[in-house]
């Protein structure tokens, strides 16, 4: 009969409590989102007025896109706030996946609005309206929008790659303090998914502003080329949709509990098999509760003479050192 023992992280929430470092990162993300919301509202008001005056669908499309951005940022802030709630017996993993759901809603808003704009542009192309489009106004507004979007991109993206996950104070049967510095240097660089979603929104606006500015310049040069306004709307709507694909893929991978892309499951299993006392590894599972928070579990068959505690420590040490996974559940089998 096999002798079996399990070992999980020593603290109650085990990687899902609201640590002080997580709270600081959430607060920083909230400040960034609040700032871009204010900028979006101000610039959106300007675009609505100027878009009507210039009779430019492209400008109005950008204004509508900004309105969606404001709603998306609000959802992101709500998600950040909710993710700070502590785990409880019913929600044992906490509320981190609210971030995933919030970002998913944000992406759906982009798709909905883009579909409406494409429909309006196609309608104008088919009907061949004779309304004039003010190219100068298009260039002026788009240039201002370009500056605003660059500011927002700098605010949202200046800390790209510095969102390390430092909240690891779990008792795994031995101390990691001696090499904490080296481990932190090797940590995966992951941004808050809500800030990343906002970043994609603003990037889409930036691309659209460039397109409107180029199209406006051509219409300003020759007013008969007003069809460019509609072509710009269609072309850049496709680009905006394209910016959401990568984020949507990450969301679906989390919801499907796929192995995170940054972790090679075969290589991890190979590393475990290289531990001297390990005979076999099976029932290996790696998934993420949200982007950047991975979980791991497996069954490890060991040699009869091997000590359970020693093997557990070696396995957990390897997973932590090489993959920075703090939430680990191991079952020892003989």
Curated annotation (Swiss-Prot):
GO cellular component: endoplasmic reticulum membrane; vacuolar membrane
Region named Required for zinc-binding: 158-174
Subcellular location(s) per record: Vacuole membrane
GO MF entries: metal ion binding; monoatomic cation transmembrane transporter activity
Residue ranges, Vacuolar side: 53-56, 119-135, 221-224
UniProt main location, coarse: membrane
Pfam families the UniProt entry points to: Cation_efflux (PF01545)
Keyword terms, alphabetized: Ion transport, Membrane, Metal-binding, Transmembrane, Transmembrane helix, Transport, Vacuole, Zinc, Zinc transport
Topology feature Cytoplasmic, residues: 1-31, 78-97, 157-199, 246-334
Transmembrane parts of this sequence: 32-52, 57-77, 98-118, 136-156, 200-220, 225-245
Membrane topology: Multi-pass membrane protein
Record GO biological process: metal ion transport; zinc ion transport
Function per UniProt: Involved in sequestration of excess zinc in the cytoplasm into vacuoles to maintain zinc homeostasis.
Family: Belongs to the cation diffusion facilitator (CDF) transporter (TC 2.A.4) family. SLC30A subfamily.
PANTHER family recorded: CATION EFFLUX PROTEIN/ ZINC TRANSPORTER (PTHR11562), METAL TOLERANCE PROTEIN A1 (PTHR11562:SF97)
Name the UniProt record assigns to this protein: Metal tolerance protein A1
Lineage: Eukaryota, Viridiplantae, Streptophyta, Embryophyta, Tracheophyta
Gene: MTPA1
């Amino acid at each position: 009969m096999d002798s079996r023992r399990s070992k999980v992280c020593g603290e109650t929430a085990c990687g899902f409590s609201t640590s002080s470092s997580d709270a600081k990162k959430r607060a920083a993300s909230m400040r960034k989102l609040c700032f871009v919301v204010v900028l979006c509202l101000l610039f959106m008001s300007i675009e609505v007025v100027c878009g009507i005056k210039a009779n430019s669908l492209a400008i109005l499309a950008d204004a509508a896109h900004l309105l969606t951005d404001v709603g998306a940022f609000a959802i992101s802030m709500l998600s950040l706030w909710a993710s700070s709630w502590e785990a409880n017996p019913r929600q044992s993993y906490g509320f981190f996946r609210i971030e995933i759901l919030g970002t998913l809603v944000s992406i759906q808003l982009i798709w909905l609005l883009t579909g409406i704009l494409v429909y309006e542009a196609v309608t104008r192309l088919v009907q061949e309206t004779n309304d004039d489009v003010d190219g100068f106004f298009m260039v002026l507004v788009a240039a201002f929008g370009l500056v605003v979007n660059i500011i927002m991109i700098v605010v949202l993206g200046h800390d790209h790659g510095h969102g390390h996950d430092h909240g690891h104070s779990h008792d795994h049967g031995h101390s990691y303090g001696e090499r904490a510095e080296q481990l932190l240097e090797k940590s995966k660089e992951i941004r808050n998914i809500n800030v990343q979603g906002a970043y994609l929104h603003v990037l889409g606006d930036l691309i659209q502003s460039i397109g409107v500015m180029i199209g406006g310049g051509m219409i300003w040069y020759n007013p008969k080329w007003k069809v460019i306004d509609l072509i710009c709307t269609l072309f850049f709507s496709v680009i905006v949709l394209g910016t959401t694909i990568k984020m949507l893929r990450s969301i679906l991978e989390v919801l499907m509990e796929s192995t995170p892309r940054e972790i090679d499951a075969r290589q991890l299993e190979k590393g475990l098999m290289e531990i001297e006392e390990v005979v076999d590894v099976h029932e290996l599972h790696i998934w993420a509760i949200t982007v950047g928070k991975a979980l791991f579990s497996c069954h490890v068959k060991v040699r009869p003479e091997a000590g359970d505690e020693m093997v557990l420590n070696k396995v957990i040490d390897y997973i932590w050192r090489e993959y920075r996974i703090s939430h680990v559940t191991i079952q020892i089998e003989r």
